Amino acid sequence: MPSANPWPSEIRLNPARDVLTVAFDDGARFELRAELLRVESPSAEVRNHGGPKTIVLGKQDVKIAGLEPVGNYAVRISFDDGHDTGLYSWAYLHQLGAEKDRIWAAYLQATSRAAAHK
C-alpha cells in the first residue's frame, strides 16, 4: 500500500533518458519507464479534463527531456515529444511505482481495445 505522504530521497534519470528512478523515504524504490510516465501523465489533456481518460498511443520511443521541481510537492516532467504539462506529485509517483504492473496491463488492454475499434 502506498505511503500516505511519501517523500523522495533520490530522483535519477538514466543516461538513455528512458527510465526515471525514484527512491522514497519509506524504503520504496521504483524504476519508471518514460513511456509509462508519458501515457499516465496527470495532465488535464491526458486525464481529459475530468472525462474519460485519453488513451495515448505511439510513445514507445519517447524520452524524458527534462525534470523541473515544482514547490516541495511535485516534479514537472517534460518529454521529447513536446508534452510538458503534467505535474507528478510525490504521492502520484509513489502510487505509479507501486501499481505499475497493474497500470501497465490496463493500458495495454485499453490500447488493444482501441486498435480493435479502428
Tell me what each language-model feature is.
Residues M1-K118:
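Motif-centric detector for short Cys/His coordination patterns
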